[in-house]
Amino acid sequence: MNRIGLFILCFALFITHVKAQIHKPTESSKPIANSKPVVDSTLIANPVTLENGGKLIEFLSAETYNVKKMDSMDFLVFVGHVQIRQGKTLLFGDSLILNTTKNTLEGFGHIHINDADSVHTYADYLKYIGANKKAFLRKKVKLTDGKGILTTDSLDYDVANKIGSFIKGGKLVRDKTILTSKEGIYYGETRDVLFKKKVELHDVENRIITDTLKYNTYSQLANFSSPSKIITGSRIISTSNGNFNIGLKKSNLYDRSTVDDSTYKFVADEMNIDDSLGTGEFKGNAIYQSKDTVGFDLWAGNIKTNKLKSILFATEQPLLLIKQKKDTLYIAADTLHTGKISDLSKAIPKARDSVGKIKDTTLDKYFEAYHHVRIYSDSLQAKADSLFYSLSDSTIRLITNPIVWANENQITGDTIYLYVKNKKPEQLNVFDNAFAINKIDTTEYFNQLKGNKLNAWFENGSISKMRTKGNAENIYFALDNDKKFIGVNHSNAQIIEITFENNEPAKVIFRNQLTGNMSPIGKIPKADLKIRGFKWQETRRPKTKLDLSPNFH
């Protein structure tokens, strides 16, 4: 049909529609009973199928109809509450023009299409192709599927395959969730909507900005396949591959996503976040960076979190970095985790005093590491089976076979407490079987101090003083001003104190029950130059931070 003919027909439809409202039907404007469908056999040769194989568009009911013929084509013009069917597809409208020759349809006003399912489409204007069941809906278009409502100004809908597309902007509303985009495709079979170009999702708690997003109106699952941001309060998630279930508040993210909050930042190859429970699991080169005054990072192959309890649980070669101005403290172990001191449910050895009321909430934190603990900083290194570090009392507790190295000093005992001030070692206490060894430059000789308990004090990261009490025993190599050996002193006392200068013993003080003597080195057997239990373990000492974990590589 040419444009002039179409205009004339549409104008005639308009006049007919007006007449139907104010006059009784005339001879050319026949009333039709709603209960009795009418098909003119002189206009439609085959009441079942057309030449192109498409099913016949059948008339069901209307208030009036007109028969038109133009350009060798036949038209039925229906006005008033029109109902038409093609197979199981029902079409409704105020006015419909049926081209019986081409099996096409144009509709005006209150258009409604349903294919005997839960998907309904509405519009002010419709052009429908019966051969392939394609509907072109325009003006105030709405599509509903029982869960979501999609609105746009222009929708091309494949009724047979239940696929609709828009390219001039659209909006989907599902409960309190609103999605908008410039383009989109609706898939009725799966209830998925693929949004493209300038996509935004809003609900009560979240905002998502992306360029491509697939959303399921039933499951409320949003899938990302392009750079996307999920904004929830102060938290921003950046990802390019993953999904977010709006209803369940669960995210599964891949391809090195990032979580950035006001107090922390997370990066990992894969993330599984459950906001309903406040939990998360971060897999593959996971990095947690705190933004509070504590200032620590946690690296691991796997990190589990509980935001409500402020818990981090790291496995797969975890590494903890406690940041300092000039000297970061690195801690590695088989397992590392952190939580609140105030939430501890069971006693930690010697740590009950840490569970009291803590005024500064940033200090209400502990770090625990167990099995194969290794520590490295420029000024101090250590190893133990387990570690407990409380920020509330600034104490690092090394438990089970602990050993500490500081410059040329090695210290061992049953349990070692390291007290930290401003993130630097301030004091060290050794409980039971304390043994300190100091290597003398490049020689084969060692100063030694042994006792029941031992205390050491630090200045600027170096040991300035040692004191042992209870069955104290000491071997000390005396040097002259030219660093030449004068002799060796082997003594016992109740208390022995050693002061250090330039990381070397400078003065020894004995208190109570002193016994011992000074002898030339050459007159003492080598076996007697070492206190019983002597064990120099320099080969176990971490030389650099690279010795702690493969994560550094």
Which sequence ranges carry the predicted segments?
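N-terminal amphipathic/hydrophobic interface segments
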Residues: 21-553
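Bacterial Sec-dependent N-terminal signal peptides
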Residues: 1-29
